Amino acid sequence: MVKFSKQFEGQLVPEWKHAFVDYSLLKKDLKRMQHDYSPQGTIITTSTPHDHHQQQQSVAAPSSYNLSHCRLLLHKLPAAFFGSNNADHAGAIQVRRRVGRGEVYETEVTPEMETTAATAAREFFARLDAQLNKVNHFYKAKEEEFLHRGHSLRKQMDILLDLKSRSSSSLSGHHRAAAGDDPSISSSSATSGAEDESTRYVTSATDTDESQHETAVMRDPEELSAEQGLEDSGSLSRQSLGRTVSSCQRKNLKINIPLTTPCRTISALTDLLRDDLVSQPKNKCDSDAGITFTTINKTKLRHAEKMIKGAFIELYKGLGYLTTYRNLNMMAFVKILKKFEKVSGKQVLSVYLRAVESSYFNSSGEALKLMDEVEDVFVRHFAAGNRRKAMKYLKPTQRKESHTVTFFIGLMTGCFVALFLGYCIMAHIAGMYTQRRDSIYMETVYPVFSMFSLMFLHLFMYGCNMVAWRKARINYSFIFEFAAGRELKYRDVFLVCTASMAVIVGVMFAHLSLAVRGFHAQAIPGFLLLGFLLLLFCPFNMVYRSTRFQFLRILRNIVFSPLYKVVMVDFFMADQLCSQVPMLRSLEYVACYYISGSYRTQEYGYCINTKHIRDLAYAVSFLPYYWRAMQCARRWFDESDTGHLVNLGKYVSAMLAAGAKVAYEKDRSLGSLSLLVIVSSSATMYQLYWDFVKDWGLLQPNSKNPWLRNDLILKSKSIYYLSMGLNLVLRLAWLQTVIHPNFGSLDSRVTSFFLAALEVIRRGHWNFYRLENEHLNNAGKFRAVKTVPLPFHEADEED
């Protein structure tokens, strides 16, 4: 059976860890008390009941904790434990509650407590009181935050239903197509008044506090003339694009849709230009009010509906976390008080638990009421009354891990090892990896296999990262915003790696066998590459389709970096590509080799010596750094944080270092060598500073952990120092360009492959500390759920 302390650590909300009861610290106080009691012959036992469920495996879903045991235990307690808010003067302790700005509990040890342990008992209850007060304060603050969010969402829902109703009425009056509205939102009937057939949008440019938002504002006719004057002057806010939508009852309603994609940005700009060129026909909603009425854009309403739906899901998740927080803390108080009774022999559970039961975090039912209300609203308006469908969004189930996956991992690993050993023996006998002038194999086939090897080595390192993050309770699924229940588990990643490498090495073995016998088999590596590309783009629901499509979306966002809003997973993946420059160059060469038809004649010189092809290869070396720099520029544009410009400078320095390397390869003069050393050394220092200080959060001079940071997830500090040293050594891999190491008769391409593999390993090592720092930042702000921006904002007409 699993001890409660391990269950407690494994099932708490990772980002709220410091707000939970410090159960381990209270246990240490009890051990000190045990030392005080033991000389007097008191029988000590600290065993815990084993009536708990086993520890859940997923870090990303702590709210899935099974609370049936907790409720059963609390129901078994005597009724006298509940309901009193007054101090209890019976037994070994007295618990008093002071009410001021908040509840504060203080416990006094009575003379009945033995004098030999009175000091330790007072220290224990002082710490226990502090924990209870901390839990109360945090619970109340989070509850108020969620209640405020719930109130805002109620207003958002009312506005959405009203606009959907007006849109439906307008469409039925003009196009006789009210049935085209979204059936998932129930609409109430509303009267629009007399309307004109030329009803259309009125566009304006406005400034808002939210970056990159598309805004819809309802204004009176007098405001429209001033607004058009601003548009004619060409003033367009850097932060937002404005769209005006009028209504009879809502005169100043802003619909803020984030411009996260190029389509939304282009659509907003097109609407602005169209409204500048076309006259604005006015229609009366009410002859006395004189308000301009316009139709409601259904596309904007769909985006708004999606945003509100996401906000409800995040609110429900947060309320679930808050319920978990309450029940786990209640269980912790019960367990630690039982342990105290066993150590001291004094009956204190009934007295102290009475105070805990009446405290705010346990007695308040507002969160549960709001949770039920959110569930009801979601079922009615976003699931068409289908509760099961709604629960798939609100409480997504985690995929069960199968032992079948583990079996196939072992099977594929065995196949890979056997085939790889056979391939190495055959390649050694054939002398394929020695320095030979007539080695067509190294020029034509080896780039394909080295490219796949680097790719799946990187994927394997990511699987190792997932194992380490899970063990360290780093909530990587929340950081990357992966869809709950659909993200890959580490076993899935290892299965993909082992199966793919077994296939690749098998093809390598077959190709080498044919090549040694003199058969023309140059098309085999090309078919292997084509097969993987077809599998990547396969539209059928097979071989992790959701993950493959998400990967393609991320690549699209990276390639068009300035046009898409940058999120964590996008720039994290772009950082991975910065470590895969050799793989990208191999991909470019292989594409040229097979597209140009050189594989038929084995004339590989075209893709090496042709000037424009060679220049393209150099451009590929710059691409990952360019994409990452553009992401920094977009983040600075969105957030106005100059730190992103400093980060952009790091990638510019990397591009300069790559350019110096290209210049040295073309002209191996002393001047080119000096330029390479100076630029590469400066870029390396820049990158090391950013790695240690910004990405890892280390090298803090005033930290309680010398030159590290205050909060560390790993227990051993020496690991952090060793990791910094390892990162420093691996960052200096560019020196091989200057030193030209020679390992006997081994081909230089094999040496380059090993150096590229070391960079991939460095990146995998870097990934762990990067996400550790991100997780600690979230934990420092107690950020366990996403804050989804809300689409509708009502403003005063004067604004």
Swiss-Prot record:
Report, as the record phrases it, the tissue specificity of this protein.
Expressed in roots and flowers.
What do the Gene Ontology cellular component annotations say?
Answer: plasma membrane; trans-Golgi network
| UniProt KW keywords | Cell membrane, Membrane, Phosphate transport, Transmembrane, Transmembrane helix, Transport
Query: Bias category Low complexity: which stretches?
Result: 180-193
Q: Which GO terms describe its molecular function?
A: inositol hexakisphosphate binding; phosphate transmembrane transporter activity
The record's section on Pfam families has: EXS, SPX
Principal subcellular localization: membrane
Residues forming the SPX domain are 2-354
Name the phenotypic consequences of knocking out this gene: No visible phenotype.
Q: Return the InterPro entries for the record.
A: EXS_C, PHO1, PHO1_SPX, SPX_dom
Domain named EXS: which ranges? 608-799
Query: Per the record, what ranges lie on the membrane's Cytoplasmic side?
Result: 1-406, 469-492, 544-672, 740-799
Q: What upregulates or represses it?
A: By Pi deficiency in roots.
Feature: compositional bias, Basic and acidic residues:
210-222
Describe the function of this protein. May transport inorganic phosphate (Pi).
Tell me the protein's name: Phosphate transporter PHO1-1
